[in-house]
């Protein structure tokens, strides 16, 4: 029941970053509003690209640039100029078809300043690890944060993966805990097995 989900919540669903430190789409909306486009141009495309064939999808791009253009499998769906008084997000509606969607952000002179791209994907076929550092002292006080994701057989990130992953640490390191950012996940932080949430899981090693 929905009430049971709320009872076991660890945090609010609101905010720009989840409990694992992973940015939500709102994080980039804030960036688009506050980052200087001259020094830190950016664009972020959402949601991920995996739906039913022909399903009508609203694709959104937030950017601090002057204008942004959407491409679906290389075909332009038009360029839109952003008006800061009406927000920094542009949207297009298009039927889903497998492949890639890409947004290109331009400055006032038509120069490309930022891009973002999403590819459609199949089921998880491999696990990928990315650590924030290569070594730690092993004294139990220094921590390494390791992001766990999955990719399909073609190497595309599976952005909605919820596979359960078990983590084992060999050598002097110790697994401190796991977090996937899902505030309603009943699994404990101090465990060696959790599901990915929105395709991501964080392992903390000391």
Predicted regions and their residues:
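Short, solvent-exposed loop/linker segments at the N-terminal edge
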Residues: 49-55, 135-144
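Short flexible loop/turn segments that cap and initiate beta-strands
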Residues: 64-66, 70-77, 115-117, 143, ...
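Edge beta-strands of extracellular beta-sandwich domains
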Residues: 110-122
């Amino acid at each position: 029941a929905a009430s049971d989900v709320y009872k076991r919540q660890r945090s609010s669903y609101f905010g720009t970053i989840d409990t694992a430190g992973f940015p939500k789409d709102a994080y980039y909306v804030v960036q688009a509003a506050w980052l200087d486009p001259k020094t830190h141009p950016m664009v972020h495309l959402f949601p991920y690209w995996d739906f039913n064939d022909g399903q009508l999808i609203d694709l959104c791009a937030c950017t601090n640039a002057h204008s942004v253009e959407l491409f679906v499998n290389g075909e332009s769906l038009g360029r839109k100029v952003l008006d800061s008084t009406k927000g920094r997000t542009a949207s297009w509606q298009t039927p889903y078809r497998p492949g890639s969607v890409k947004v290109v952000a331009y400055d006032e002179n038509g120069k490309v300043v930022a891009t973002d791209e999403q590819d459609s994907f199949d089921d998880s076929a491999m696990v990928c690890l990315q650590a924030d550092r290569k070594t730690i002292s092993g004294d139990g006080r220094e921590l390494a944060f390791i992001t766990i994701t999955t990719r399909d057989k073609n190497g595309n990130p599976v952005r909605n993966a919820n596979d359960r992953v078990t983590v084992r640490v060999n050598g002097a390191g110790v697994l401190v805990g796991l977090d996937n950012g899902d505030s309603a996940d009943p699994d404990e932080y101090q465990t060696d097995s959790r599901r990915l949430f929105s395709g991501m899981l964080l392992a903390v090693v000391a």
